[in-house]
């Protein structure tokens, strides 16, 4: 699709465990609904990460220009120090369920993508994200990927890291991904 395709954005709010989660649904327009859909998870809130992260917005925009709807949301107080906890996992699970139920999204063409902390949350929640047909990870923490069950996952998985990323060791991530079962792809961007 050409890059000049108009994009519609809508603020959404939904409940997770009795608390409000705010998000934005980005929908390509014009387009033929129901759209494929992707839930996009942001980097660590303690380091300024939220749904308006430049990388998250770029991902959502790129998806919309390709005819794919997206949901990005702000994690609730999802951290204990710098650690991931079950709150962030529930936020991803519920966001995907909510998006799956949206009439403009094709429920058999869903995926999830996470950036940094968001990638770790998806890795931890991956076994419960059964409606996601594909998983993507941008600069994921290597330890989170190692600890997850992604190695045995049979869905398509895509891992991408910048060649000059100071937090993610591209070589270590490449080794972890290469040991996974089928459909796991790794790319380093320079």
Residue ranges and their predicted role:
Residues 71, 179-190:
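Catalytic histidine neighborhood in serine/cysteine hydrolases
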């Amino acid at each position: 699709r050409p890059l000049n395709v108009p994009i519609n954005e809508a603020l959404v709010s939904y409940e997770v465990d009795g608390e409000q989660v705010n998000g934005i649904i980005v929908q390509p327009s014009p387009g033929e609904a129901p759209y494929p859909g992707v839930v996009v998870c942001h980097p660590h809130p303690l380091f300024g990460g939220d749904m308006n992260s430049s990388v998250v917005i770029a991902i959502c925009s790129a998806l919309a220009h390709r005819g794919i709807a997206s949901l990005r949301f702000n994690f609730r107080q999802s951290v204990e120090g710098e650690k991931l906890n079950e709150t962030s996992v529930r936020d991803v699970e519920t966001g995907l369920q909510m998006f799956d139920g949206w009439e403009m999204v094709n429920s058999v063409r869903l995926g999830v993508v996470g950036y940094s902390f968001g990638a770790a949350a998806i890795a931890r929640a991956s076994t419960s994200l059964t409606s996601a047909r594909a998983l993507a990870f941008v600069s994921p923490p290597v330890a989170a990927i190692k600890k997850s069950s992604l190695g045995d996952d049979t869905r398509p998985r895509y891992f991408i890291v910048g060649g000059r990323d100071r937090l993610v060791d591209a070589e270590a991530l490449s080794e972890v991904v290469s040991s996974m079962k089928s459909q796991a792809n790794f790319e380093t961007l320079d």
